Curated annotation (Swiss-Prot):
Its EC number is 2.8.1.10. GO terms for cellular component: cytoplasm. 1-deoxy-D-xylulose 5-phosphate binds at G159, A185, G186, A207, T208. This is Thiazole synthase. It is found in: Cytoplasm. It comes from Mycobacterium marinum (strain ATCC BAA-535 / M). Belongs to the ThiG family. One of its GO terms (molecular function) is thiazole synthase activity. Pathway: Cofactor biosynthesis; thiamine diphosphate biosynthesis.
């Protein structure tokens, strides 16, 4: 069991795995995966939300007791992202938002300039902002300085499954951050999630790695276990890396007691 909770702004969560909902073939498959993951916080694209209720995604999250985290997926400018966040606040009655401002459809990488502009406006408007950002320590610090409640650097581009391509930068972000760091995007399998936590991240957000797996529920369970294992390993402290081997058992030295020589 994870020994302490994930705290972002004024909310605490027992699970350090945040799930996305994109890519699931249907709600039944998504439900199985969400239950298996143990997540308590799940992103939803506001453009997919049926604000009138019904039997859709929001009803599912409500039945499972999972907090929805609206995101601004698909937005290409600060103005568009701010408007989408404001619509989400009205539709879902929450001031939390996962902020995404994408530079282009080919890479789905964040537009750093528009991202900071949107973050500044949303923080001023009373939002709890969780920005999806590049693995850039300087940009992460700038977002924190604007008042973001967490920073969410990518491991690799969305949906690639390449894992963490620049672990050193993630470590630098963790080392200088005064807010939670959530590894977001690029996770391909459980070992990637474990590595993120070992590098010092406070949580992992993933979607495609689960929703497009051959067995989404099984992969969700694996991701949950990996996040816990990586977190506990980080707290336990890994041994230093060494160039040469070092025996784990002490060398035994056999000596004769005084007067034991033959003939005496």
């Amino acid at each position: 069991m994870v020994e302490s909770k994930l705290t972002i702004a004024d909310r605490s969560f027992a699970s350090r795995l945040i799930m996305g909902t994109g890519g699931a073939s249907n709600l039944a498959v998504l439900q199985e995966a969400l239950v298996a993951s143990g997540t308590e916080l799940t992103t939803v694209a506001i453009r997919r939300v049926d604000a009138e209720g019904g039997t859709g995604l929001l009803d599912l999250l409500n039945r499972l007791g999972i907090t929805p985290l609206p995101n601004t997926a698909g937005c290409r400018s600060a103005a568009e992202a701010v408007l989408t966040a404001q619509l989400a606040r009205e539709a879902l009655a929450t001031n939390w938002v996962k902020l995404e401002v994408i530079a282009d459809e080919r890479t789905l990488l964040p537009d750093a300039i528009e991202l900071v502009r949107a973050a500044e406006q949303l923080v001023d408007d009373g939002f709890v902002v969780l920005p999806y950002t590049n693995d850039d320590p300087v940009l992460a610090r700038r977002l924190e300085d604007t008042g973001c409640a967490a920073v969410m650097p990518l491991g690799s581009p969305i949906g690639t499954g390449l894992g963490i391509t620049n672990p050193h930068n993630i470590e630098m972000i963790v080392a200088s951050a005064g807010v939670p760091v959530v590894l977001d995007a690029g996770i391909g399998t459980a070992s990637d999630a474990a590595l993120a936590m070992e590098l010092g991240c406070d949580a992992v957000l993933l979607a495609t790695a689960v929703t497009r797996a051959a067995d989404p529920a099984a992969m969700a369970a694996a991701m949950s276990a990996a996040v816990t294992a990586g977190y506990l390993a980080r707290r336990a402290g890994r041994i230093p890396k060494r160039f040469w081997a070092q025996a784990s058992s002490p060398t035994l030295v056999t000596t004769q007691s005084p007067g034991a020589e033959s003939g005496n």
